[in-house]
A protein has these predicted regions:
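Positively charged n-region of N-terminal signal peptides that target proteins for export
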Residues: 1-5
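Repetitive helical segments and hydrophobic/amphipathic motifs
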Residues: 11-12
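Glycoside hydrolase catalytic-domain context in secreted enzymes
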Residues: 20-613
C-alpha cells in the first residue's frame, strides 16, 4: 500500500511539473523608450511596438468637442481612438475664454491621451496667426501683409516669440502659422495673410518668424502648400478665388513658390499644411508629385504634413474612404478631420486591410509625427510659462510692429500732426478693435466691435493729444484737421473674397464713400487712414484727401499709429503689393516682365517718409 501511495505521489508530482513546463512563460512587461536613447531610437521603438490601430489613431487630428457637445471628439473618444492630435478651430473656445479655461481644456485632453493604450500624448493645435487671436484679451499683432510692409526680420522673430509665449500659456503645442504664400489677385479674401507679392521679402521674413514661433515648445506650421495666392478668379468658392485653381508652370514653382517653403524647412519648421487649392487642375491634397516627390523628397522635409480642415472632402473618390486613402497615399501624414475623425480612422484601417495603404506609408507618417512630438518635448511634463497676457514686452513689440507697418502714400504737407491741434475723427474703422484687427480675431471671421482689450485709433488720439478730439461731422468748423478711417469688413477665407475692390463693395462700407464725398469740399486738411487687408480702390477719391496712410490690419495697438502721425517716429513701411489704379490691374505684380511703376496708383515698394514727403 505504501508503495502504491508513493507511486501515486510521484505520478502527481510529475504531472504538475509537466504542466508547469508547458505553461506559456509570461511576457515581460513592455518597457517604454529610455531617456538616454536618441529620438530616432525612441521613434523606432514605438514603430515596432504600436498596433496598426494605435498608428491609425496617431494620424488623426480631431476638433475638441464643442461646448454644446454637438461635434468634435470627447475625452473618451480621444482615449479610445488613440488620437494623435486635437485642435481648436477658429472661434471654438472653452467656456469663459480665459487662460485658465484654455489650460484646463488642454490638460484634460492631454490626460485623456495618456490613458490610451499607447499612452502617447496629443499635440494640440490652434490658429494663432497674428498673436493668440482666439483668446480674449491676448495681444493681437498686425496681420502678415502689414509685417511684409515693415520687412524687419528681427521684428518678425520677436512677434513669433511673443505669440508662442501667449500660446504656450494656454497649453497649446502646435500653431497653424505662418502663412507664407504670395499674393497675385488682390481680391482674394486671404490677401492679408500673405507676405505680399515679392518672394525675396517673404524669404527674408519666413525663417526668423518660424524660429520665434517655435519658442516655448511650440510646433509651427508653414502653410498653405503651395501657390494658394495665385488662384484664378472664377475657379474658387462661390465663383471667386479662395480654394480655386492656380495655373503655375514648373519654372514658376521652382523659382517663386517652392523657395519659400525651403526657407521654412531650413528654419526647422515642424509641420507643413497643404492648400485647399489646386495646381493646374490637380487638388493639392492628392498631388503626390508635389507632396511626396518634391516636398519630402527633393526638399528633404523631415517634419509631418497635415491636411487642412476637412479638405479631404474635395479630393477625388467615390466615397469618404476612397478620399482618405488617396490623401494618405499622396503623402499627407496627419488628417485634420474635426468631426469625421472616427470615419477617417476606420478608412485608414480599411485601406491597410485592403492593401491600398502600405504599412511603410503608415510607418512613415507616424514616425514623422512622433519625431515632432519628441522634438518639442511633449513626452515630458509640460513646462508652461506663467500667465501674463498683454505684458509690457508683448505690447511694446505689437506697437512697434504697427509703427513700422504703416505706409505713407500721400502727404501734402499735413503730416506730422501737432499734438496741439483739434481733430475730428470719423469713419467705420475709427473706434472698432474688431475692424482694426480683421478676420481670425476672437472668432474665425472676426467681428465688429470692441470685444477684446486694445486701443482703438480714436482712443489713441484721445490719449496723445493736447487738443480736443471730436467725433461728429457737425463739428467740422471746430477742428484743425479731419482723420477719416476708411475700412474693410472683418472676414476670413472665401467670405473675404471680393468681386471688385471698391470702397463700398462686398467687403467695404458705404460709409467710406459717404464720408469722402461729404469731405470733398472742406477747407481744412483731410487725412485718410485705410484699415484693410486689400488695396481698396482710391483712384476717384485720392484728390479729396491731403494725406493717405495704408495701415492694413494693425491689431489692438492703435497707439502705434499716433506714434507716427504725431512725428514721434518716422514712416518706414513700403507697399508689399501693387496698389491698382483700376480693377483691371488687380492681378499685376512686380514680378510681371513688363511691370511699369508709373501705371499704378502706387507701385510695389512705394512709401514716403517725412523728409521726402
Amino acid at each position: 500500500m505504501k508503495k502504491l501511495l508513493t507511486l501515486c505521489v510521484i505520478i502527481l508530482i510529475a504531472m504538475v511539473l509537466y504542466a508547469c513546463q508547458n505553461e506559456p512563460t509570461p511576457e515581460p512587461e513592455m518597457t517604454k523608450p529610455d531617456d538616454a536613447w536618441t529620438i530616432e531610437e525612441k521613434v523606432a521603438w514605438w514603430i515596432n511596438h504600436l498596433t496598426i490601430e494605435e498608428k491609425a489613431g496617431q494620424m488623426i487630428q480631431a476638433e475638441r468637442t464643442t461646448n454644446n457637445g454637438v461635434s468634435g471628439a470627447t475625452l473618451f473618444e480621444t482615449t479610445s481612438y488613440n488620437l494623435g492630435s486635437i485642435l481648436n478651430g477658429g472661434g471654438n473656445v472653452p467656456v469663459g475664454n480665459t487662460v485658465t479655461s484654455w489650460l484646463n481644456m488642454a490638460n484634460n485632453y492631454r490626460q485623456a491621451s495618456l490613458k490610451s493604450t499607447s499612452g502617447i500624448p496629443i499635440i494640440y493645435g490652434v490658429d494663432a496667426v497674428h498673436g493668440h487671436n482666439n483668446l480674449v484679451n491676448s495681444t493681437i499683432f498686425p496681420h502678415n501683409i502689414g509685417l511684409a510692409a515693415a520687412n524687419n526680420p528681427e521684428l518678425m522673430r520677436l512677434i513669433g516669440e511673443q505669440t508662442a509665449y501667449e500660446v504656450a500659456q494656454t497649453g497649446m503645442s502646435m500653431n497653424f502659422s505662418p502663412s507664407i504664400g504670395l499674393i497675385k489677385d488682390k481680391r482674394w479674401g486671404r490677401t492679408y495673410e500673405t507676405l505680399g507679392e515679392n518672394p525675396e521679402v517673404a524669404k527674408n521674413l519666413i525663417g526668423p518668424y518660424i524660429e520665434g514661433l517655435q519658442s516655448y515648445h511650440i510646433a509651427a506650421t508653414a502653410k498653405h502648400f503651395v501657390g494658394d495666392g495665385y488662384t484664378v478668379f472664377g475657379t474658387g468658392m462661390d465663383g471667386r478665388l479662395d480654394r480655386g485653381n492656380a495655373n503655375i508652370t514648373e519654372e514658376e514653382l521652382l523659382d517663386i513658390h517652392l523657395p519659400l517653403y525651403q526657407e521654412a524647412i531650413d528654419a526647422g519648421v515642424k509641420s507643413i499644411m497643404i492648400s485647399y487649392s489646386s495646381i493646374n487642375g490637380v487638388r493639392m491634397h492628392q498631388n503626390k508629385h508635389l507632396i511626396t516627390d518634391i516636398l519630402k523628397g527633393d526638399m528633404q522635409f523631415k517634419g509631418f504634413i497635415i491636411s487642412d480642415y476637412e479638405a479631404t472632402n474635395d479630393v477625388s473618390g467615390s466615397n469618404f474612404e476612397d478620399k482618405i486613402i488617396r490623401t494618405v497615399n499622396a503623402g499627407i501624414d496627419m488628417l485634420m478631420e474635426p468631426n469625421k475623425f472616427d470615419q477617417a480612422y476606420r478608412a485608414i484601417l480599411a485601406g491597410y486591410d485592403k492593401n491600398e495603404i502600405e504599412l511603410s506609408r503608415i510607418n512613415d507618417a507616424v514616425s514623422r509625427i512622433l519625431t515632432v512630438k519628441y522634438e518639442i518635448g511633449l513626452f515630458d511634463e509640460p513646462d508652461l510659462p506663467d500667465a501674463d497676457l498683454r505684458n509690457e514686452t508683448s505690447l511694446s513689440v505689437a506697437r512697434q510692429a504697427v509703427r513700422e507697418s504703416l505706409v505713407l502714400l500721400k502727404n501734402d504737407g499735413v503730416l506730422p500732426l501737432s499734438k496741439d491741434q483739434d481733430l475730428l475723427i470719423l469713419g467705420p474703422g475709427s473706434h472698432n478693435i474688431g475692424i482694426q484687427s480683421g478676420g481670425w480675431t476672437i472668432t474665425w471671421q472676426g467681428q465688429e466691435g470692441n470685444s477684446t482689450e486694445g486701443t482703438t485709433i480714436l482712443e489713441a488720439f484721445q490719449a496723445e493729444t493736447n487738443g480736443t478730439i471730436y467725433t461728429s461731422i457737425d463739428d467740422l468748423d471746430q477742428v484743425d484737421a479731419v482723420i477719416v478711417v476708411l475700412a474693410e469688413k472683418p472676414a476670413a477665407e472665401w467670405f473675404g473674397d471680393s468681386d471688385d475692390l471698391s470702397l463700398n463693395g462686398r467687403t467695404g462700407y458705404q460709409e467710406n464713400i459717404d464720408l469722402l464725398e461729404a469731405l470733398s469740399d472742406v477747407d481744412i486738411p483731410v487725412i485718410a487712414i485705410m484699415i484693410s487687408g486689400k488695396p481698396l480702390l482710391m483712384t476717384d477719391y485720392l484728390e479729396v484727401v491731403d494725406g493717405f496712410i495704408m495701415a492694413f490690419l494693425p491689431g489692438t495697438e492703435g497707439l502705434g499709429i499716433t506714434d507716427v502721425m504725431y512725428g514721434d517716429y518716422n514712416f518706414k513701411g513700403q507697399l508689399p503689393y501693387t496698389y491698382p489704379k483700376v480693377l483691371a490691374q488687380v492681378t499685376h505684380t512686380m514680378l510681371d516682365p513688363n511691370y511699369d511703376p508709373d501705371d499704378y496708383l502706387f507701385p510695389y515698394g512705394f512709401g514716403l517718409t517725412y523728409p521726402d514727403a
